[in-house]
Regions:
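Juxtamembrane/interface alpha-helical elements of multi-pass membrane proteins
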Residues: 1-66
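Hydrophobic alpha-helical transmembrane segments of multi-pass integral membrane proteins
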Residues: 2-4, 139-144
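Membrane-interface, cytosolic juxtamembrane amphipathic helix immediately N-terminal to a transmembrane helix
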Residues: 23, 97-140
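Amphipathic alpha-helices that form helix-helix packing interfaces
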Residues: 26-29, 33, 64, 90-94, ...
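Residues at alpha-helix boundaries and the short loops/turns that link adjacent helices
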Residues: 54, 68-71, 100, 104
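Cytoplasmic juxtamembrane interface segments
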Residues: 64-80
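Short, non-transmembrane cytosolic segments of multipass membrane proteins
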Residues: 75-104
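Juxtamembrane "helix exit" motif at the C-terminal ends of alpha-helical transmembrane segments
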Residues: 143-151
Length: 151
């Protein structure tokens, strides 16, 4: 029972960390995209193709690229790419990012999304530390109670 509780706590903590790491990686990816649009003037399909190689969030960019290749408008493909993303807050930030207009407007939208994702990742890290302490305290209290009941 103790081992099961410890494994459950560990799984919860790892899942939460993965979501936080994904938000941070998304912020880095969007920052990279904004820089490449600004300096290299790369087209969006090439940018999505590059970001599709990322470990934690590449699948979202790949789905967006797939939608573009099927003929979807950029904004629709972008929103579809991030529809099932976790954490849901990050998905909302990305779906709300408007990729319409000229280069300057797109770069501005990506940069704003980067800042919001970085804030989300920072907030989740702070919450995660507190949640980890509570989980372990609850698990140890439960284990102690179980041992007392056995005695």
């Amino acid at each position: 029972m103790l081992l099961g509780t410890a494994l459950w706590c560990r799984g919860e903590i790892q899942a939460r960390r993965r979501e936080t790491d994904r938000a941070a990686e998304l912020a880095a990816a969007l920052g990279e995209m904004a820089a490449e649009i600004r300096s290299l003037r790369r087209p969006m399909p090439r940018l999505l193709e590059r970001q599709a190689r990322r470990v934690l969030c590449g699948g979202c960019f790949a789905r967006g690229l797939w939608g573009l290749e099927r003929g979807q408008p950029l904004q629709d493909a972008w929103e579809d790419g991030f529809r099932e993303l976790t954490p849901p807050e990050a998905a909302g930030i990305l779906r709300d990012t408007e990729l319409t207009g000229d280069e300057e407007r797109i770069v501005s939208a990506l940069t704003a999304a980067v800042h919001r994702l970085e804030e989300l990742a920072d907030r989740r890290r702070r919450e995660s530390r507190q949640r980890e302490r509570l989980l372990w305290a609850a698990a140890l209290s439960g284990a102690g109670l179980f041992i007392i009941l056995l005695i």
